[in-house]
A protein has these predicted regions:
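Eukaryotic intrinsically disordered, low-complexity regulatory linkers and tails enriched in Ser/Thr/Pro
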Residues: 1-154
Length: 154
């Protein structure tokens, strides 16, 4: 069995009585009935040659798939470095976005239409690999045991 890392201090995971898995995240909320989960996956891939994406997907019998992911830059010197481009373009917008929505730009899913638009996909970005690993552990435990869980990132 894979060794489990300690969950970050800004996360909490506890059983609930609802037979649902619930995620309360800084950028939104997600809930699914446990009987509707058909598969759970955790995987990593390289995006545009310079970002490592680590992703947890939860597939359901409904019409949508949910993706939770964490981004890590591979190199700071690449001319395609999306992280630097986003930081440069968004420096003046961060404060206005947070004031208007209550969400930091760093917590928001970043898309390039139409390349990263996924029909019927709900997406959440997490800010650390530890948060993503804790989320995977929570949803997998709920699905495996049939007991609802509530996962929170503060």
């Amino acid at each position: 069995k894979e060794e489990e890392a300690e969950a970050p201090k800004n996360t909490a995971d506890e059983e609930n009585q609802k037979r649902r898995w619930i995620a309360n995240l800084p950028s939104g909320k997600y809930a699914v009935n446990l009987g509707n989960i058909t598969s759970i996956s955790e995987h990593s891939y390289l995006l545009n040659g310079n970002l490592m994406v680590t992703e947890v997907t939860v597939d359901t019998t409904g019409a949508s798939l949910v993706r939770f992911y964490y981004l890590e830059p591979i190199t700071d010197s690449s001319t395609l470095n999306i992280v630097d481009r986003i930081k440069n373009r968004s420096s003046g917008l961060k404060d206005r976005t947070r004031d208007r929505t209550g969400i930091s730009v760093d917590e928001m899913v970043q898309k390039t239409y139409p390349d990263t638009t996924h029909a019927r996909t709900v997406e959440f970005r997490l800010l650390s690999r530890g948060e993503l690993k804790a989320l995977y552990g929570s949803v997998y435990t709920a699905w495996d045991t049939g007991k609802g869980r509530t996962f929170n990132v503060k």
